[in-house]
Curated annotation (Swiss-Prot):
InterPro entries: Herpes_UL16/UL94. The gene is 33. Keywords: Host cytoplasm, Host nucleus, Late protein, Virion, Virion tegument. Interacts with cytoplasmic envelopment protein 3 and with the capsid. It is found in: Virion tegument; Host cytoplasm; Host nucleus. The keyword Cell membrane does not apply. The keyword Nucleotide-binding does not apply. Its main location: virion. This is Cytoplasmic envelopment protein 2. Signal peptide: none annotated. HAMAP family: HSV_CEP2 (MF_04039). Plays a critical role in cytoplasmic virus egress. Participates in the final step of tegumentation and envelope acquisition within the host cytoplasm by directly interacting with the capsid. Upon virion binding to target cell, a signaling cascade is triggered to disrupt the interaction with the capsid, thereby preparing capsid uncoating.
């Protein structure tokens, strides 16, 4: 791969797969930003080896603008030097609500000589992971109530699991318990979406099952770095789904039966032993998506009333996608 193609891929990777956190190593002379993102289906490209370790990609960019010279950007990936170049354009905007920065890089070209490559000075403290709060997700969402609110027929809708959510037009669409009912919902550590709740009550007991409990290869996007010894909430990612549905459409209820009140009428809850996935097509009718199954094999219609269909903002949807390799593979097919 030539340097021009390599830099073209790097530019698009930085612009379309990274959100940034300003690092405490920044000074008046050199600005340091870090980003962490799940492994990419597109970068570093075919037949190119990923620098450093396996797992999430940790990126550091160090920006210097000497007097009377063009900006120089130095990139490290997983601690390995990748490139030192000049962006033909550069844009930076802080998003205080989430403690992140949006960086945009133009074409990457050779820097002016002489070019001194600075060492990687980014510092990272072993701090707890940072997650999107329920309030942040709700405040970023738009309610979809009518057929006119749904994506147009020509728009590709990508289902991420048997019960949603869906990605369309850069927005994550998911059924969520009506916010007015959240006070009644037992804490499951994340926004109580339909897919999360159904997976929660049907997950297997094997905590090493990546399908039910998530894997450790998720990136902590809001921290700007993913450390090797921590699991960053992958058990609440939309990629998680009951392992019992790998080869079928039925998942037996295994735990947390107190959550059934959000799924089925009171008179039928004691009879339901499993959940059947009916269709993962985006719809305003929840009863087209799943139903309950009794011991006798009879189907029980689910409740429609507790559920609202929300579309998350493009930025929050990017945060979710950038944290998960599986979602990237499904939704990020080209630059």
């Amino acid at each position: 791969m030539g340097s021009r193609e390599r830099r073209w891929l790097l530019k698009h990777f930085l612009n379309k797969e990274c959100l940034w956190v300003k690092n405490s190593a920044s000074t008046a002379v050199i600005k340091v930003y870090t980003s962490t993102t799940a492994r990419s289906p597109l970068w570093p490209g075919r037949h190119a080896a990923m620098p450093g370790i396996e797992g999430p990609i940790n990126v550091t960019v160090q920006l210097m603008k000497p007097k009377d010279r063009k900006m120089c950007a130095t990139f490290y990936v997983n601690g390995v030097f990748v490139d030192s170049c000049t962006p033909t354009a550069f844009y930076c905007r802080e998003v205080q609500r989430y403690g992140i920065y949006l960086l945009f890089f133009g074409d990457l070209v050779d820097p002016e000589p002489p070019n001194v490559i600075p060492e990687n000075i980014a510092v990272h403290k072993n701090e707890p992971p940072v997650h999107l709060t329920i309030l942040q997700m709700v405040n970023s969402a738009t309610l979809l109530k009518t057929p006119d609110d749904l994506p147009k027929p020509h728009v590709e809708v990508v289902p991420l699991g048997p019960f949603g959510p869906w990605m369309a037009n850069g927005s994550l669409l998911q059924y969520t318990i009506n916010p007015d009912l959240l006070i009644c919902c037992p804490s499951i550590g994340t926004l109580p979406t339909m897919s999360n709740i159904i997976t929660w009550i049907t997950k297997c007991e094997n905590e090493e099952c990546e399908s039910c409990h998530g894997n450790s290869d998720h990136a902590c996007v809001l921290r700007g770095v993913t450390l090797a010894d921590q699991n960053y909430g992958s058990d609440t990612c939309p990629c998680v789904a009951p392992c019992s549905m790998r080869h079928g459409n039925i998942a037996r209820i295994t735990t947390s039966s107190n959550l059934l009140g959000f799924l089925f009428p009171p008179e039928s809850q004691n009879d339901i032993v499993a959940i059947r996935a009916k269709s993962n097509k985006l719809t305003l009718n929840v009863q087209d998506i799943f139903c309950g199954v009794t011991r006798e094999g009879e189907e029980v219609a689910c409740l429609q009333s507790p559920w609202l269909l929300f579309g998350l903002s493009h930025l929050v949807s990017r945060m979710v996608m950038y944290g998960c390799e599986s979602i990237k593979r499904k939704c990020l097919r080209s630059y």
